[in-house]
């Protein structure tokens, strides 16, 4: 079985320590079983969004050659959003293989997740039908998104 490079471990240790010492408001990060390569995260729905009052749990998993490959994100809290699918996948531009660079910090990734909660990006959706509804029938989108928060994101 392959093992992580010392530079991957150092980088993750540094980024994790930075996020614990200087947390991003409304984001919590913890290691899963003391594993630097698997984080459990929680994002609080921004107060100025349809996701206000929700707690959204997700995991960050890092490849052994991080930061040369992007982490994967899996949302475990169901969310009605054009950039998140029902399997927990997230469409985040900076994590796409052709865009991701080693210079991208995890702080930026987490801040962009909060930004997606604040303002969905219907131009780069994972769920085209929700993106279409967001563009063309915003009141219905907002109602369903709020209903999902009440039903799935209040714990």
Curated annotation (Swiss-Prot):
Catalytic activity: S-ubiquitinyl-[E1 ubiquitin-activating enzyme]-L-cysteine + [E2 ubiquitin-conjugating enzyme]-L-cysteine = [E1 ubiquitin-activating enzyme]-L-cysteine + S-ubiquitinyl-[E2 ubiquitin-conjugating enzyme]-L-cysteine
Entry keyword Nucleotide-binding: yes
Pathway: Protein modification; protein ubiquitination
SUPFAM superfamilies: UBC-like (SSF54495)
CDD domains xref list: UBCc_SpUBC14-like (cd23815)
GO CC list: nucleus
InterPro entries: Ub_conjugating_enzyme, UBQ-conjugat_E2_core, UBQ-conjugating_enzyme/RWD
Record function comment: Catalyzes the covalent attachment of ubiquitin to other proteins. Mediates the selective degradation of short-lived and abnormal proteins.
Family to which this protein belongs: Belongs to the ubiquitin-conjugating enzyme family.
Protein name from the UniProt record: Ubiquitin-conjugating enzyme E2 14
Organism of this sequence: Schizosaccharomyces pombe (strain 972 / ATCC 24843) (Fission yeast)
Lineage start: Eukaryota, Fungi, Dikarya, Ascomycota, Taphrinomycotina
């Amino acid at each position: 079985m392959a093992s992580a490079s010392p530079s991957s471990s150092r980088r993750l240790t540094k980024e994790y320590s930075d996020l614990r010492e200087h947390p991003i408001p409304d984001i919590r990060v913890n290691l899963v079983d003391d594993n630097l390569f698997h984080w459990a995260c929680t994002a609080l729905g921004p107060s100025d969004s349809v996701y206000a009052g929700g707690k959204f749990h997700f995991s960050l998993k890092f490849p052994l050659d991080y930061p040369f490959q992007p982490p994967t994100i899996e949302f475990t809290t169901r969310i009605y959003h054009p950039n998140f699918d029902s399997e927990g996948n997230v469409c985040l531009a900076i994590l796409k293989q052709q865009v991701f660079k080693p210079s991208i910090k995890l702080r930026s990734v987490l801040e962009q997740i909060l930004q997606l909660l604040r303002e969905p990006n219907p131009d780069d959706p994972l769920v085209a039908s929700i993106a279409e509804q967001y563009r063309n029938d915003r009141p219905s989108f907002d109602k369903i998104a709020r209903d999902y928060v009440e039903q799935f994101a209040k714990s």
